[in-house]
């Protein structure tokens, strides 16, 4: 092995691509915060844009440019009932995570998605959200989307998911924000 000495120090700037998981959660936490949240390096992919679309339909003002997004949050209880079905597109992450938030609202919401989302298992979130006090129904009766979520005051639970899933954990943790 030969060790070579650098002739000059390494300098530069590296821009890391946006992260899908962080981008989804940034929108959600920004919407639930009081005031404006500024997010740079947001991943402008279809799944993350579905999350933005859903929160706009829940009454959250979100400005989106290529440089940043600004989310004008209204606090934990500031979401408003949507006037239409929330379409999560092809985003299972949006579907599962937003379900935890909707479970603690004082209104009913219907979530749907594309054919792929409608074939993905949602029983893994229906069970804990129901245990917490929400009414969550698979409208096709197959434990998949579309889901109708009637929010209620929630109760804290001890829950061990039978599947290892960051989405299930995040869903339950987000619902926990509304639990007594």
What are these regions, as identified by a protein language model?
Residues 1-180:
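Structural preference for solvent-exposed beta-strand-turn elements
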């Amino acid at each position: 092995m030969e060790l070579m000495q650098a002739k000059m120090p390494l300098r530069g700037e590296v821009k890391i691509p946006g992260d899908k998981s962080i981008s989804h959660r940034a929108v959600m936490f920004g919407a639930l915060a009081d005031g404006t949240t500024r997010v740079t390096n947001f991943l402008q992919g279809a799944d993350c844009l579905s999350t933005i679309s859903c929160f706009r339909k829940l009454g959250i003002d979100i400005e989106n440019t290529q440089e940043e997004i600004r989310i004008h949050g209204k606090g934990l209880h500031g979401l408003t009932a949507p006037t239409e079905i929330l379409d999560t597109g092809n985003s299972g992450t949006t579907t599962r995570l937003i379900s935890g938030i909707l479970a603690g609202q004082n209104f009913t919401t219907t979530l749907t998605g594309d054919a792929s989302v409608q074939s993905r298992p949602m029983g893994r979130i229906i069970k804990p959200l129901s245990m917490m006090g929400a009414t969550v129904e698979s409208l096709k009766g197959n434990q998949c989307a579309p889901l109708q979520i009637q929010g209620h005051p929630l109760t804290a639970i001890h829950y061990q998911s039978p599947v290892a899933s960051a989405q299930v954990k995040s869903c339950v943790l987000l619902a926990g924000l509304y639990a007594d």
